[in-house]
Amino acid sequence: MELKDYYAIMGVKPTDDLKTIKTAYRRLARKYHPDVSKEPDAEARFKEVAEAWEVLSDEQRRAEYDQMWQHRNDPQFNRQFHHGDGQSFNAEDFDDIFSSIFGQHARQSRQRPAARGHDIEIEVAVFLEETLTEHKRTISYNLPVYNAFGMIEQEIPKTLNVKIPAGVGNGQRIRLKGQGTPGENGGPNGDLWLVIHIAPHPLFDIVGQDLEIVVPVSPWEAALGTKVTVPTLKESILLTIPPGSQAGQRLRVKGKGLVSKKQTGDLYAVLKIVMPPKPDENTAALWQQLADAQSSFDPRKDWGKA
């Protein structure tokens, strides 16, 4: 058998770090992938690159390979390694060859340790109304299966029934232990993380734990005061608009905001004064009477002053 020069195959130096080797592997894997490459020997080159990566990507295997490469001209190495059959060494021969040259203890010491599986993140959209109480949700996601080279080989569809707790906030992460990818060599599974995304609401804006809603009122309602029906996340309430209210004024409704374990926010009604359509002759006359009665009022009196 012939001991291959994995560094030459990858186009890297023995002193290069793993990041450099990984970059080279990805470039060569794309270049020689049988599905995309037009090279006549693409499949063989792809397998050769994958074999080199399998050894050089593992710190312990790489150290053992370097030791074997260093001893490749030693008589003991040649007796144990070369059989005169013209075959080439590959990664599957590693255990037998290495242990025969350097001892059974070396073989046992290079067994890969248990490795934890990968975590998975998926985004879960939640409506504002759903944040008030715990609710059940069926979620579907794809569970990736990795090959020996750390590449996704396939994706397995998976469905779970989960509970979304009350009071979740935008960007909050919920951990589902052990629902990620399987561990290796007896290692624990990774976790599934649900990342909460609060869906935009047509009426409410979120400000911390509080909610804001724009309430349209007429000029006379703002001037004289009135009561208007305003929706909340649970039910509608009757909101008092005090006389002399201004555009942009915020009226607080206590305890009608978002709910969490620590506190309940408030709802703020932001007044928006809406003018009626272009007035007819009679309406214009009424507006003129109002203007005459308030002739001393200058809305721009303090405009631009600090």
Swiss-Prot record:
Transmembrane portions of the chain? none
Gene3D superfamilies hit by this protein: DnaJ domain, Single helix bin, Urease metallochaperone UreE, N-terminal domain
Annotated compartments = Cytoplasm, Nucleoid
Which residues, if any, are the signal sequence?
Answer: none
Q: Keyword RNA-binding, does the record have it?
A: no
* GO MF annotation terms: bent DNA binding; unfolded protein binding
Write the record's keywords in alphabetical order, separated by commas: Chaperone, Cytoplasm, DNA-binding
| BP term (GO), one | protein refolding
Any one GO CC term of the record: cytoplasm
Main subcellular location = cytoplasm
Q: Which PROSITE patterns match?
A: DNAJ_1 (PS00636), DNAJ_2 (PS50076)
Q: List the InterPro entries.
A: DNA-bd_curved-DNA (IPR023859), DnaJ_C (IPR002939), DnaJ_domain (IPR001623), DnaJ_domain_CS (IPR018253), HSP40/DnaJ_pept-bd (IPR008971), J_dom_sf (IPR036869)
Q: Does the keyword Protein biosynthesis apply?
A: no
Query: Which segments constitute the J domain?
Result: 5-69
NCBIfam families attached to this UniProt entry: PRK10266.1
What is the role of the protein in this entry? DNA-binding protein that preferentially recognizes a curved DNA sequence. It is probably a functional analog of DnaJ; displays overlapping activities with DnaJ, but functions under different conditions, probably acting as a molecular chaperone in an adaptive response to environmental stresses other than heat shock. Lacks autonomous chaperone activity; binds native substrates and targets them for recognition by DnaK. Its activity is inhibited by the binding of CbpM.
Protein name from the UniProt record: Curved DNA-binding protein
Which organism is the protein's source? Shigella flexneri
